[in-house]
C-alpha cells in the first residue's frame, strides 16, 4: 500500500493521539476541512494495524503515546509506504528523534490554521473544503 495522494476528492488522514479530548478536536477539525479520518488511535500496535487496513494520504502523529510509547515505529512504516506525516508535540522540535529532523512539526497547543497549513503544504492538489462542500476561506 502506498499513499494515495491523487485518489479521490476527500483525503484520508490518520490521527495518532493519546489525549482523548485533543484527539476529538483534531478529528473534528479535519472532518470540517473535508477529510476522512482514520483513528484516532493511541498506541503503536493499533496504529500499525490501521495503516495496513486503511489506505491513508497523510498522518498527524503525537510523538509520545500511551504507556510511554513513542510513535517512531509508525513513522518508519509510513515512510516505507511514502505517506507524509506531521509530528504534533508539546516539546517542540527538540523533542523529536534526530533521525526525523527534516519532518514537519507543529507544537501543541496548535491552531486550526496550522493544521490547514500542513494539509495544504503536504497535499496541495486536494480541495480543502468544509463538510458542506463549500470551499473554505483562508
Spans of features found by a protein language model:
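Conserved phosphotransfer microenvironments
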Residues: 61-79
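Two-component/phosphorelay signaling modules centered on CheY-like receiver
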Residues: 20-39
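Non-catalytic signal-transmission and effector/linker regions of two-component phosphorelay proteins
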Residues: 1-14, 45, 104, 111-138
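Hydrophobic/aromatic residues positioned on beta-strands within the core alpha/beta folds
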Residues: 88-89
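Conserved phosphotransfer cores of two-component systems
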Residues: 52-54, 77-83, 94
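Acidic, metal-coordinating helix/loop segments flanking the phosphotransfer/catalytic sites
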Residues: 40-58, 63
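As written
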Residues: 99-106
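Conserved acidic carboxylate
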Residues: 17
Amino acid at each position: 500500500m502506498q499513499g494515495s495522494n491523487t485518489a479521490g476528492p476527500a483525503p484520508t488522514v490518520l490521527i495518532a493521539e493519546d489525549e482523548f479530548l485533543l484527539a476529538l478536536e483534531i478529528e473534528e477539525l479535519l472532518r470540517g476541512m473535508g477529510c476522512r479520518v482514520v483513528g484516532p488511535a493511541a498506541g503503536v500496535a493499533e496504529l500499525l494495524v490501521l495503516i495496513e487496513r486503511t489506505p491513508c494520504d497523510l498522518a498527524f502523529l503525537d510523538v509520545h503515546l500511551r504507556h510511554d510509547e513513542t510513535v517512531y515505529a509508525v513513522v518508519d512504516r509510513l515512510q516505507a509506504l511514502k505517506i507524509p506525516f506531521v509530528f504534533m508535540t508539546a516539546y517542540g522540535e527538540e523533542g523529536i528523534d534526530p533521525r526525523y529532523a527534516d519532518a514537519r512539526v507543529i507544537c501543541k497547543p496548535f491552531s486550526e490554521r496550522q493544521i490547514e497549513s500542513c494539509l495544504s503544504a503536504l497535499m496541495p492538489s486536494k480541495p480543502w473544503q468544509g463538510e458542506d462542500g463549500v470551499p473554505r476561506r483562508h
